[in-house]
């Protein structure tokens, strides 16, 4: 694993990461990989994984580079967020395409955990390509990696709360705890997910649309599947107008989502659903939007205790933290994710 990264390689890895981020939410069950082809004069082309059945990121970038200037490909370098695949599925092996293009150097971040696709790095080395695995953050791939690791959908629990941990005031009001910058960020985040999950309590109380919208209110190009968990009937409203899927339990919902190709799921439910999901021990990530206000009472994050003593607490580790307007965003991941 290489940690000392040159400026040129770092720029290419950033370009590759950005290319992968742009296609998040459109590629499952395949990973949202990004790729950049570059040489001493800079970035030649970038590419992201196409929807299932389409080209992998490496082929998109190589094809784009060839259309711009095929001569620059010979002896060029390639940065990619996931080890190039070494198998034939709906498309041919990416490692063979890299060798055929005349690429001399490959820099990749994550090993491919899928045994059917792994081995690309070894193939490239055997065919004279210099290959380096880089220590570089690629957040957009993490949910897919979690899904492969655990054999289920990757679950992110999202909530907006006050400093003292309440999601609604004592009278039930909750609009709006967070500011406009945070609310827009949530919509952009939704667009990168395969599905949004709420409980029937939220569906009945809030009449949510569960859409991903741009700043002007228009729908973003990618819309996640809308999932309702619970047995109560959802009345006529936004969800019945837009379309949704309903399952009796979180286990049933997650199993059906995984079987149908979803890999990255966002849970936005109230305290009952959140409690059930945490009890299942399937929450891989938490995104907490914390507003600079106090209620001193009201509706909490969960509808009851998860543990009896501090030694049994469900623990997560800090992944990232930043501000949006007046709010703080705290992102956490499972402590055992790298075990």
PLM regions: where:
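Short secondary-structure capping/turn micro-motifs that flank functional sites
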Residues: 114-115, 138-141, 205, 273-274
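Short, mixed-charge, low-aromatic patches
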Residues: 14-22, 80, 97-102, 138-145, ...
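Zn2+-dependent cytidine deaminase-like catalytic core
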Residues: 37-137, 278
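Helix-turn-helix
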Residues: 34
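Proteins enriched for Cys/Gly/acidic motifs involved in redox and nucleic-acid/cofactor modification
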Residues: 25-29, 53-54, 121, 127, ...
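Active-site beta-strand termini and strand-to-loop segments that position acidic
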Residues: 39-40, 149-150, 333-335
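Enzymes that bind and transform nitrogen-containing heteroaromatic metabolites
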Residues: 1-31, 45-46, 65, 90, ...
């Amino acid at each position: 694993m290489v940690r000392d990264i040159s400026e040129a390689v770092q720029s290419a890895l950033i370009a590759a990461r950005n290319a992968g981020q742009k296609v998040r939410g459109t590629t499952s069950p395949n990973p949202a990989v990004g790729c950049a082809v570059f040489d001493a004069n800079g970035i030649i082309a970038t590419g992201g994984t196409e929807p299932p059945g389409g080209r992998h990121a490496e082929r998109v970038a190589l094809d784009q580079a060839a259309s711009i200037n095929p001569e620059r490909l010979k002896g060029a370098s390639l940065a990619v967020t996931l080890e190039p695949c070494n198998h034939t599925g709906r498309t041919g092996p990416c490692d063979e395409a890299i060798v055929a293009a005349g690429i001399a150097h490959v820099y990749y971040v994550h090993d491919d955990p899928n045994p059917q696709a792994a081995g690309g790095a070894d193939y490239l080395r055997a065919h004279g390509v210099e290959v380096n695995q880089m220590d570089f953050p690629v957040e957009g791939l993490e949910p897919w990696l979690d899904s492969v690791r655990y054999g289920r959908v990757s679950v992110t629990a999202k909530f907006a709360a006050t400093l003292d941990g309440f999601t609604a005031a004592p009278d039930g009001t909750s609009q709006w705890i967070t500011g406009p910058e945070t609310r827009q960020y949530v919509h952009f985040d939704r667009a990168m997910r395969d599905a949004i999950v709420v409980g029937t309590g939220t569906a009945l109380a809030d009449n949510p649309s569960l859409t991903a919208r741009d700043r002007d209110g228009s729908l973003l190009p990618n819309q996640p599947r809308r999932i309702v968990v619970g047995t109560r009937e959802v009345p006529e409203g936004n969800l019945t107008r837009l379309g949704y899927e309903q399952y009796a339990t979180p286990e049933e919902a997650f199993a059906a989502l995984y079987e149908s190709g979803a890999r990255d799921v966002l849970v936005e439910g109230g305290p009952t659903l959140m409690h059930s999901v945490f009890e299942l021990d399937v929450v891989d990530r938490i995104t907490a939007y914390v507003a600079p206000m106090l209620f001193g009472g009201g509706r909490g994050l969960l509808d009851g205790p998860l543990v009896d003593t501090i030694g049994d607490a469900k623990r997560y580790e800090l992944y990232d933290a930043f501000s949006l307007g007046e709010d703080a965003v705290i992102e956490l991941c499972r402590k055992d994710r790298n075990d």
